């Protein structure tokens, strides 16, 4: 007689595939007091929660980034031949399944509630992104172990990751660039808008603005593509181009460093017109669904960064959750392209949107 296995044992070992609803429910429970996972992630509930998940001050920079992006509308078109849109693209010499990269985020305890450690989070995002056919950026903070955890995750991914470093003294940045190079990272850079970051002050870590000469030194210190994240003006985009920067990211740091800034989507088009033929331009800011990616591409970005939803993925479903978040965004982008007549992510025009 075959041994009868109880239903309880079967349920214990059975693998249930997660979905977005389950991931978000898990994350909401595990991030109580830090993130409410609001139906509309608009920065209202979490305003002023820095450290935490919100925007600094009254939270207006977060709110503006959300509101301005939502005010951009897409033009629906259904009489066309774009039946099977191409989502694949190449960034930093890597073929990606769609033009989205995981943003650099650290501080799981004081920003996210601590359900996952910084080490676990780094592994989740780097490997989860790889599972989804794209790449993740790892971040830097006052605790040196955070950067170390990110570097170790990049090593596990055979170098498929990007190291973004706080705007420390140049010698400290270069030291970390060399560590990233040894790990096989595909690109390195700084988030220049971290120059006044509150969380760095908590650790007594000196950060500050960079001159064009500083940028030139950093660019020339490595053979890897060099990125500057946190550009919000045409003037600074031009300075980055003059310094030989490979890629800029139009970003207001999720509204977490300076209140009352412009939204990234407000300045993106002008920046692309000014430097888009010289350097790569990516953007971030309130990307919550696939149609948001479409909007940024229509404004001229070559790709976007995904921030807060990736946190939900890690906290709510770990590595698999990150993969599911990214694949959901990819599927939504695919559908949005069909319904707007866009056949390739590399040639989405401004005619796709109305500002």
Question: Could you describe each region identified by the protein language model?
Answer:
Residues 106-117, 163-171, 225-232:
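Active-site mouth loops of central-metabolism enzymes
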Residues 334-355:
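Charged C-terminal helix
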Residues 61-143, 147:
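N-terminal functional module of multi-domain proteins
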Residues 16-97, 348:
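An N-cap/entry alpha-helix motif that binds or orients negatively charged groups
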């Amino acid at each position: 007689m075959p041994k009868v296995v109880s239903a309880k044992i079967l349920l214990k070992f059975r693998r249930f595939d997660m979905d977005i609803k389950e991931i978000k429910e898990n994350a909401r429970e595990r991030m109580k007091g830090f993130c409410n996972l609001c139906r509309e992630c608009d920065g209202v509930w979490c305003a002023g929660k820095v450290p935490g998940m919100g925007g600094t001050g009254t939270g207006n920079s977060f709110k503006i980034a959300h509101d301005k992006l939502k005010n951009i509308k897409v033009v629906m078109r259904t009489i066309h031949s774009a039946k099977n849109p191409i989502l694949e693209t190449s960034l930093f010499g890597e073929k990606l399944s769609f033009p989205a990269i995981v943003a650099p985020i650290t501080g799981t305890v004081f920003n996210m509630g601590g359900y996952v450690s910084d080490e676990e989070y780094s592994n989740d995002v780097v490997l989860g992104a790889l599972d989804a056919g794209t790449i993740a950026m790892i971040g830097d903070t006052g605790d040196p172990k955070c950067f170390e955890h990110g570097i170790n995750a990049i090593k596990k991914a055979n170098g498929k990751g990007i190291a973004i470093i706080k705007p420390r003294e140049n010698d400290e940045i270069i030291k970390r660039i060399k560590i990233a190079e040894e790990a096989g990272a595909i690109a390195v850079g700084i988030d220049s808008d971290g120059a006044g970051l509150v969380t760095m002050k908590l650790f007594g870590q000196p950060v500050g603005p960079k001159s064009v000469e500083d940028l030139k030194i950093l660019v020339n210190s490595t053979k890897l593509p060099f990125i500057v994240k946190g550009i919000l003006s045409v003037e600074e985009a031009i300075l980055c181009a003059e310094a030989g920067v490979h890629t800029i990211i139009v970003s207001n740091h999720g509204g977490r460093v300076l209140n009352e800034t412009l939204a990234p989507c407000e300045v993106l088009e002008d920046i692309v017109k000014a430097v888009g033929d010289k350097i790569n331009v990516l953007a971030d800011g309130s990307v919550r669904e696939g149609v948001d990616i479409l909007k940024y591409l229509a404004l001229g970005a070559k790709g976007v960064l995904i921030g807060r939803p990736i946190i939900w993925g890690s906290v709510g479903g770990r590595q698999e959750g990150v993969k599911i978040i990214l694949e959901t965004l990819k599927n939504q982008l695919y559908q949005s392209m069909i319904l707007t007549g866009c056949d390739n992510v590399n040639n989405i025009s401004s005619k796709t949107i109305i500002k």
